[in-house]
Amino acid sequence: MLVKTTHFGEINIKDEDIIEFSEGIVGFEDIHRYGIIRNQNSDSPFSWLQAVEKSELAFAVVDPFVIKKDYDFVLSDEYVKALDINDPSQVNVYAIVVVPDDLTKISMNLKAPVIVNKDNRKAAQVILDTDEYTVRHYIMDELQKQEV
């Protein structure tokens, strides 16, 4: 699918990289279809969620397990059913990233991960019922903890 974007120009997104949120993303509930744009550098854990219907809307995302090795949560039966998940291997998890001017404050939202069923491309942003994670988990702080 050819998609016009503000950030990347006109790009071709493969059908298998188009995902659909039945309820949208928090704050953008009216936007349902996004393309996953993977970083050309295959070693990078970062990707983009580009709205198909709105050229200027794109979210930086990251595989949270790459940054926070002990990230763990249980997906509620409601979401397992809504996304038609039968096996954990069907799932990709992304955390939306905020990139401020001060790059030392780059953060990811671990409180509300994006869950994607790779097989049927259904997606949902799930707000976890826990105080263990926040919407601003600082990536640089996490990486420094791992170096110690």
From Swiss-Prot:
Report the main location listed first in the record: cytoplasm
Location(s) in or outside the cell: Cytoplasm
InterPro entries in the record = Flagellar_assembly_factor_FliW, Flagellar_assmbl_FliW_dom_sf
| One term under GO cellular component | cytoplasm
PANTHER family (UniProt xref)? FLAGELLAR ASSEMBLY FACTOR FLIW
Q: Does the keyword Cytoplasm apply?
A: yes
Provide the family line.
Answer: Belongs to the FliW family.
For this chain's UniProt record, which GO biological process terms are given? bacterial-type flagellum assembly; regulation of translation
HAMAP family for the chain: FliW (MF_01185)
Keyword Cytoplasm found? yes
Functionally, this protein is described as follows: Acts as an anti-CsrA protein, binds CsrA and prevents it from repressing translation of its target genes, one of which is flagellin. Binds to flagellin and participates in the assembly of the flagellum.
Which of UniProt's keywords are assigned here?
A: Bacterial flagellum biogenesis, Chaperone, Cytoplasm, Translation regulation
A Pfam cross-reference name: FliW
Record's subunit section = Interacts with translational regulator CsrA and flagellin(s).
- Specify the protein name: Flagellar assembly factor FliW
The source organism is Ruminiclostridium cellulolyticum (strain ATCC 35319 / DSM 5812 / JCM 6584 / H10) (Clostridium cellulolyticum)
